[in-house]
Regions:
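Positively charged, polar, low-complexity stretches
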Residues: 1-96
Length: 96
């Protein structure tokens, strides 16, 4: 992913609300599965890490990206954004 594409995705993600929260139990298999399923409806997902989670948000973001086969767009504070294009009909068209 180029920096131009990443910047474009960041601009789209700025208006998104987090649809998942990582809490004190950190990454459970159920949460990872739910995030993976959310990519069936969304290509861009924002996730929040709650204050009671002791793990580093950057590490959590990397782990979720690996497990869901998505790309990490950005980590800001305790929120991160993931992108996974739809295989059949991509909704978001990235700049070249």
């Amino acid at each position: 992913m180029t920096s131009k594409q990443r910047a474009y995705l960041k601009s789209l993600a700025s208006n998104l609300d987090p649809i998942f929260q990582v809490g004190k139990f950190s990454l459970t298999p159920e949460l990872t599965d739910a995030i993976g399923e959310a990519f069936n409806n969304n290509e861009l997902i924002k996730i929040a890490v709650l204050k009671n989670c002791l793990d580093d948000p950057k590490e959590i973001a990397q782990t979720v990206a690996e497990r869901t086969h998505s790309q990490l767009v950005q980590v800001i504070g305790k929120k991160f954004v993931l992108y996974k294009p739809d295989k059949d009909k991509p909704k978001i068209e990235l700049p070249k």
